[in-house]
Amino acid sequence: MADNFNFELVSPERLLLSEMVTEVVIPATEGEMTVMAHHAPTMTTIKPGVVSVRSASGKKQDYVVFGGFADILPTGCTLLAESAVPVEELHKDELTRRIEAARKELEDTELHEHKSKLEHFIMELTHLRGVVQQD
């Protein structure tokens, strides 16, 4: 049986989850990471994606996050999301609205570095929209 650890998912609006879990899969910017008890201390940035949580009771919960940071310690993990919502509460048009807003910002920007970041962000959101709509 896997050991449990404390996981917290926090957005500026609210604390979405704080409970003992067996594993959490997070969309780190360098690739998906599975976090379990006794994980090596790590700090990572989060890209838009789905956070999958397996609670100590075995229940699986998914959340959509739109970037942030994760602080991982052997005894727990805290994910500070720029924005987050349970998958079942995500409105279908929310991702489309965010993609369109990023495209509008892309049209209005002059800086090459900012354009590159926006193009990458649009790609991540488009991929996320495909993943969420398949579930």
Swiss-Prot record:
Pfam short name (any one): ATP-synt_DE_N
Keyword RNA-binding attributed: no
A single GO molecular function term of this UniProt record: proton-transporting ATP synthase activity, rotational mechanism
NCBIfam families, per the entry: ATP_synt_epsi, PRK00571.2-4
Membrane topology: Peripheral membrane protein
Protein family according to the UniProt entry: Belongs to the ATPase epsilon chain family.
Domain of life: Bacteria
UniProt entry keywords in alphabetical sequence: ATP synthesis, Cell inner membrane, Cell membrane, CF(1), Hydrogen ion transport, Ion transport, Membrane, Transport
Name of the protein this chain belongs to: ATP synthase epsilon chain
Quaternary state and interactors: F-type ATPases have 2 components, CF(1) - the catalytic core - and CF(0) - the membrane proton channel. CF(1) has five subunits: alpha(3), beta(3), gamma(1), delta(1), epsilon(1). CF(0) has three main subunits: a, b and c.
Protein's job: Produces ATP from ADP in the presence of a proton gradient across the membrane.
Recorded GO CC terms: plasma membrane; proton-transporting ATP synthase complex
Keyword match Ion transport: yes
Ranges annotated as spanning the membrane: none
HAMAP family hit by this protein: ATP_synth_epsil_bac (MF_00530)
Subcellular location: Cell inner membrane
